[in-house]
C-alpha cells in the first residue's frame, strides 16, 4: 500500500492529475506477464519451468522486462515471473512456498536493490521496517542471511540457482551508493560460493559497458523518488519507451538510475541464458 501511495503522491507532485496518477499506479502495480499466480492456476508446462525471482527489475513494469527477453531467447522453456515491486530479501524469503510450488528446475534471483536503498540512510531504513512490517531494519548482514536461506530452500527443493549481482545505482561508480552496491555484491558472491549457486556478474558487465562509453562518472544516485516517478509518468502517460526516457535524462542503461533500459535488461537476459545453457559466466 505504501508503494502505491508514494507513486501516486509523487506523480501528483510533478503535475499529473489525480486520474493520471491513479492510472500510473495501476500500470506499475499490474501483474507481471506469466506470473506465479498464472502458472499455479493451471497453465503448467510439462517440463520444469525457469523462475525469475526478485523485485521490480524482475517484475518488468518499471523496467524493461528481461524475463520476456528470456522467453524470446529460449523459446523451448517456460518462464515464470516472480518479481514483486519493492521487495527486500526477507520478503522474498516469505514468498518461497508459492515459488517452490511451481517446481522450478532453475531459479534466477535478482534482489537487493531495495535492501541497499534502505541501508543508505537511517531514516530510510526505519521507514522500510515500519511500512513493510519487517522484523528488523535492513542491513548488509541481514540481507546476506536472508539470501542464504532463500538459496538453501530452493536448492533443497531441487532447483539450480543463479544469483545476479546488483546493477549500479546511478552512473557514478565511485560514489558511496555504488561502494555499497559492491559490498552487497560481495555478499552475493559469498552466498553463491557457500550454497552451490552460480554467480551472474550483472554489475560487472554493466559497469564495463559504462566505462567503455566514458559514462561511469555520470549522474549520481541521490535517493530521490523523483527520477523514478518521472520515468513512470513519461512511460505510461506519454508513451515513451524506457530507452527514450533514459536518453532524455542523460542516462545510459537506466531510465531512472535504478531500473533497466533495453541494453541493461539484455545484459541480464544474456547472462541468464548463458546460465541455462550451461555456460559459466563467472570471471567477467
What are these regions (language model features)?
Residues 1-3, 26-32, 152:
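Short, intrinsically disordered low-complexity segments
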Residues 19-108:
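Serine-esterase "nucleophile elbow" of acetyl-processing enzymes
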Residues 1-9, 39-40, 282-284:
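Short, low-complexity, intrinsically disordered N-terminal peptides in bacterial proteins
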Residues 2-25:
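Hydrophobic alpha-helical topogenic segments used for membrane insertion/localization
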Residues 44-46, 69-75, 91-284:
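Alpha-helical cap/lid subdomain in secreted, periplasmic
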